[in-house]
Amino acid sequence: LIITDPAHLTGAMMKNKTEPGKHEIYYFRQDSAASFLCEADIDALDLSDILAVHFTGIFPSISDSAAAAARQLVKRAHENEITVVFDPNLRCQLWDNSPETIALLNEFAQSADVFLPSLKEAETLCGLTNPEEIADYYISRGTRKVVVKLGKQGAFYKSAVECGTAPTFAADEVVDTAGAGDGFAAGLISGICEEIPLG
């Protein structure tokens, strides 16, 4: 689905590499076209051939109407037996880590079929630092599968039927980690759609 909005600009992100291993990122999302998405836009979606829906915490953070749209997306996905994957993707430029913010992101985490936090994000959201305890926390609240990203240590995964740690892919030199989480999510979702076990 592509919706055009002649009244608002497309959101953008610019990244400035200041020195090896470091960068500055600038976001231009306020009053973007995406921030005006609403429940009616979600209701117009044809979900008949969709296997999975993936979104991050950025989507509901950009406006109240986007948060409502995200809720409607989750609702419609569940009604159509579509797997919902949620990555909190915490961004200090968007979130203040207030109790209201944490409650909102936990709402989406607990309504997702698959939750993909980093260890640091999970600690912010639930106060736990042990990957298995984090997984148990969300599974006990309705999430079916939890995958905790552990950086160089790989990823911990748990569901009702499997549990373990997957190693990272070895690289001789890491130039930039931007987009690594998105790439990880894409691979994971592809595997889920193909019904490949997490382990």
How does the language model describe each region?
Residues 1-57:
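Conserved N-terminal subdomain of the carbohydrate kinase-like
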Residues 7, 31, 90-92, 151-153, ...:
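Glycine-rich beta-alpha junction loops
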Residues 12-13, 23-26, 83-84, 114, ...:
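Structural motif
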Residues 12-14, 38-42, 101-103, 132-135, ...:
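A generic local structural motif
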Residues 18-21, 101-105, 135, 162-166:
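Short, hinge-like loop/turn segments at secondary-structure boundaries
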Residues 45-48, 110, 141:
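Structured loop/turn residues at beta-strand edges in well-structured enzyme cores
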Residues 52, 58-137, 153-155:
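Conserved beta-alpha-beta core of the PfkB/ribokinase-like small-molecule kinase fold
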Residues 75-79, 127-199:
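Conserved phosphate-binding/catalytic region of the ribokinase-like
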